[in-house]
Regions:
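The serine-hydrolase catalytic nucleophile loop
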Residues: 1-8, 22, 164
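Conserved alpha/beta-hydrolase
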Residues: 10-27
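Alpha/beta-hydrolase active-site loop
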Residues: 31-54
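Alpha/beta-hydrolase fold nucleophile elbow
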Residues: 53-65
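Hydrolase active-site cap/lid region
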Residues: 76-131
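Short beta-strand/loop motif that positions the catalytic acidic residue
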Residues: 145-146, 152-154
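Conserved alpha/beta-hydrolase "acid-adjacent" motif
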Residues: 159-165
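Catalytic active-site module of serine/aspartate enzymes centered on a nucleophile-bearing elbow/loop
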Residues: 182-183, 187-207
Length: 207
């Protein structure tokens, strides 16, 4: 999906892409998922400033779901290294702090989180307690403001990123924008979200 996104949407607009695995999966499986969810990506962000052929004044980060948590976190703690951030359906607060929303997590998501945390997926109450630290509001970030413009995209019926979180994320940034979809089919919404992402990146990176 990300290769197609790059080839069909980013490359034609002169935008490069570097894709990173989240801690606990893929090539980053030896990195445990901890409260500092962004430490791996932050290290890469610092490294890019030393790469001669990368314009470190025009770096953006796009994150989907839990990766949106990482992108949003870096918008707050690395405002001078990011030109803009895009978060899509990002789990940033309520899914980790609201017991009813956390209980909606499907089994596959529970197993994935447990694996990254080194926890037992069957011990759901313990899992919920451990995951509360991933809330950017609990961390004291969401509720402050960042100078990095954030495009926050979500769906009205998404339990991982409720509309309130979508709008709170955009409101916490300078010239941020919230887009909340409310229609089916999801594939159509997904394509529209990709269109919005590209236009946002062009606006902030190519002008």
């Amino acid at each position: 999906d990300f290769l197609n996104f790059y080839l069909k949407r980013l490359e034609p607009n002169g935008i490069g892409m570097l894709s990173l695995d989240m801690p606990g999966i893929g090539y980053a499986e030896h990195w445990p998922l901890v409260q500092d969810t962004s430490r791996l990506h932050q290290a890469v962000l610092h490294y890019l400033s030393e790469v001669a052929w990368v314009d470190h004044q025009r770096i953006a980060m796009v994150g989907f779901r839990l990766a949106g948590n990482v992108a949003a976190r870096l918008a707050f703690i690395e405002p001078f290294k990011l030109k803009t951030v895009v978060c899509v359906g990002a789990g940033v607060n309520q899914v980790f702090t609201n017991q009813e929303l956390f209980a909606k997590c499907p089994r596959m998501m529970r197993d994935s989180l447990a694996n990254r945390l080194g926890a037992d997926a069957a011990q759901w109450d313990g899992m919920r307690t451990k995951c509360q630290v991933f809330s950017l509001k609990t961390q004291g970030l969401l509720g402050t403001r960042t100078s990095v413009p954030i495009l926050s995209i979500g769906h009205k019926r998404d339990f991982i990123c409720p509309e309130q979180d979508v709008r709170a994320l955009a409101a916490a940034s300078r010239n941020g924008k919230a887009i909340v979809f409310d229609k089916q089919p999801l594939l159509e919404v997904y394509d529209k979200a990709l269109d919005e992402i590209v236009e946002w990146l062009k606006q902030h990176l190519c002008t």
